Amino acid sequence: MAIHLYKTSTPSTRNGAVDSQVKSNPRNHLIYGQHRCGKGRNARGIITAGHRGGGHKRLYRKIDFRRNEKNIYGRIVTIEYDPNRNAYICLIHYGDGEKKYILHPRGAIIGDTIVSGTEVPIKMGNALPLSDMPLGTAIHNIEITLGKGGQLARAAGAVAKLIAKEGKSATLKLPSGEVRLISKNCSATVGQVGNVGVNQKNLGRAGSKCWLGKRPVVRGVVMNPVDHPHGGGEGRAPIGRKKPATPWGFPALGRRSRKRKKYSDNLILRRRTK
């Protein structure tokens, strides 16, 4: 991803650094509208995910995470921006006339050909079962359940690594550092997700953040005691606790949030490191 730096003409653009413009021209049969009514609230109207609200209207792009077009070659026609994710998407024209969106693999350009199936070449953008991949292959868009479609390593710049195969399972090292077992029959896409430099972006002003549906973040220590456990005190006071807490009083910053005795515990060989 090419980073574009603005000229220092105004305060709002002085620190701005955004990616080069990638246009979006979605196909009508591959998009549909979404009714965004939650804004971070649950069914009872209580805020469960903070700092969300507003934002520009979006049309959802139908992404092909399953890659069901087996042994049919497709050609990358466009590389487009998707407002629903950090990664770019590619429009693929298959030989049988189908047109679908997939996640943009890093390094793929317009005109490249891709294919999915068994015993296909180990080439960037191709999708095939883990059993047909050599050890050390970099992959993304990984299935957890056979036939359900890719669920792991789909964010911009995400990449996992195939480190072992034994019996009916394959061992993967995920982007979070977690090492886990997955069925060798599950499929994945070769390569890394594109738009790697997305974390280098600096929007430069609060208005650009609002367009994305992200509201301001306020520290708990500057609130009143009725609003946050860290609030209150005279002047710049400490939080008054041994450990930081969430607005609802639960331990924050380091507490394990994974459900205990989950069915997949025996599949995780090493917990994530971040």
Swiss-Prot record:
User: GO molecular function, one example?
Assistant: RNA binding
Keyword S-adenosyl-L-methionine found: no
One Pfam family of this chain: Ribosomal_L2
Where found, per UniProt? Answer: Plastid, Chloroplast
Q: Where is it found, in Gene Ontology cellular component terms?
A: chloroplast; mitochondrial large ribosomal subunit
- Keyword Ubl conjugation (UniProt): no
Give the region (Disordered) as residue ranges.
Answer: 1-22, 224-274
> Which named protein is this?
Large ribosomal subunit protein uL2cy
Species name: Glycine max (Soybean)
Organismal lineage: Eukaryota, Viridiplantae, Streptophyta, Embryophyta, Tracheophyta
